[in-house]
UniProtKB/Swiss-Prot annotation:
GO terms for biological process: 'de novo' UMP biosynthetic process; pyrimidine nucleobase biosynthetic process. Keywords: Glycosyltransferase, Magnesium, Pyrimidine biosynthesis, Transferase. The lineage of its organism: Archaea, Methanobacteriati, Methanobacteriota, Stenosarchaea group, Methanomicrobia. Orotate binds at residues 118, 146. SUPFAM superfamilies: PRTase-like (SSF53271). It is an enzyme of class 2 (transferase). This is Orotate phosphoribosyltransferase. It catalyses: orotidine 5'-phosphate + diphosphate = orotate + 5-phospho-alpha-D-ribose 1-diphosphate.
Amino acid sequence: MDTELVEMLKQTGAVKFGDFTLSSGRKSTYYVDKYIFETNPVCLSVIGDRIAKLIPAGTRRLAGIEIGSIPLAAVASVKSGMPFVVVRKATKGYGTNKLIEGVWQKGEKVFVVEDVVTTARGALGAIHTLREAGLAVDEMVCVVDREEGGRESLEQEGVKVRSLVKSSELLGYKP
């Protein structure tokens, strides 16, 4: 368990308790507010360091998923020197009209960066987009794994999931 990061997420107020509806539609008694840890420079820097250390050998690009994991991919890119791309959920209808923004080449190995994994619907959509474009994705990282089936869904798609923190660690840790 990464005690420093668990404490940081709690101390910044990123872990909230109450009645919440998650993006999946599920109800929960706790919420991990990614915008709290993504907008705190100290927390973001620590997360970037952690992600940079997990980048698998042979990786050519990181991938951030619109909108939530873009700051995470950006800081990990800065910390590691590894370029990144942005994966959109849908084309904008103007400009370049791309689903994958940034520079990349078919066949490159990509390490997907995600904020919070619950059902993994967003991560799976991004992985399918990357694979359809000819990029190789077999590993990803998330800051928090809520341990609600997302990891298993990703593994069924052949994607190894690394998490910086698991919900059981967040909820069970007492300093």
